[in-house]
């Protein structure tokens, strides 16, 4: 029996394993996919914006007033803390013109490799292709390549994500075997803006618009967008 069983090998699960293994707990980290951090790697294809290099009070303006539950998390792991943590993995960073912080490699794979390597050195047990199907007290039953397997732990930490990308592991099937967990209905949080363009915009589909400012009420964002057939999308939104 391990001290902590962590279910989900995305950034939340990896960070939990990173923190708890530093405190010398025995950790088993499982994921239903063949490898961990798949959506994290996909995020890195666009450069992997990790945080913003700006005063903390200004940084908070990047978040909606409707998300006060984020405040304590942001205070406990500030942009400076994020940068210190990344550099502790041997990853070099740079700050872009809008204050966004990126790894110099402009991708996630070097960071993920260093992260997993540190977990391995601390003795974290990593298991793949482990699909959780039922919970019984402090034991979790999994479907594996070799049949069903039960793992018991003193504590179980769920870091299974939402329903954003089934192909990369975020399928929200945990709702079926955790029926007593209350959750809000899943909805997209990173979306474009639909616009019914007039015909003369056709020739601009796929074109970026850079170094702009967008406003919605009191909220302002600086960045860039891309004109698409159905509207606009990109980091600025």
Give residue ranges: language-model regions.
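N-terminal Rossmann-like FAD-binding beta1-loop-alpha1 element of flavoenzymes
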Residues: 2-29
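Redox-cofactor binding/interface segments in oxidoreductases and associated redox assembly factors
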Residues: 7, 42, 158-159
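Cofactor-binding loop segments of dinucleotide-utilizing enzymes, especially the Rossmann-like FAD-
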Residues: 9, 32, 188
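Glycine-rich FAD pyrophosphate-binding loop
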Residues: 21-45
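Conserved dinucleotide-binding and phosphotransfer motif residues
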Residues: 23, 89, 122
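Glycine-rich active-site loop/strand segments that organize a redox cofactor
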Residues: 47-95
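Helix-loop-beta segment of a Rossmann-like dinucleotide-binding subdomain
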Residues: 65-73, 87-113, 153-155, 159-167
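Predominantly flavin-linked oxidoreductase catalytic cores and closely associated redox partners
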Residues: 109-110, 115-237
């Amino acid at each position: 029996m391990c001290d902590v069983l962590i279910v989900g090998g995305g950034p939340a699960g990896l960070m939990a394993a990173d923190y708890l293994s530093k405190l010398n707990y025995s950790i088993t980290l499982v994921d239903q996919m063949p490898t961990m951090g798949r959506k994290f790697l996909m995020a890195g294809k666009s450069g992997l914006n990790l945080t913003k290099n700006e005063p903390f009070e200004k940084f908070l303006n990047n978040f909606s007033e409707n998300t006060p539950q984020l405040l304590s998390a942001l205070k406990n792991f500030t942009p400076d803390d994020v940068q210190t943590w990344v550099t502790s993995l041997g990853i070099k960073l740079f700050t872009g013109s809008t204050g966004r912080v990126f790894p110099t490699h402009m991708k996630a794979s070097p960071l993920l490799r260093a992260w997993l390597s540190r977990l391995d050195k601390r003795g974290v047990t990593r298991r793949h292709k482990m699909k959780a199907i039922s919970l019984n007290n402090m034991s979790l039953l999994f479907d594996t390549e070799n049949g069903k397997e039960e793992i018991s732990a003193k504590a179980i930490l769920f870091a299974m994500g939402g329903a954003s990308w089934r192909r990369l592991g975020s399928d929200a099937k945990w709702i079926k075997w955790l029926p007593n967990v209350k959750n809000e209905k899943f909805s997209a949080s990173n979306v474009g803006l639909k616009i019914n363009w007039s015909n003369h915009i056709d020739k601009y589909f796929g074109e970026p618009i850079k170094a702009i400012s967008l406003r919605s009420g009191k909220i302002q964002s600086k960045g860039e967008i891309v004109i698409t057939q159905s509207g606009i999308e990109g980091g600025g939104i």
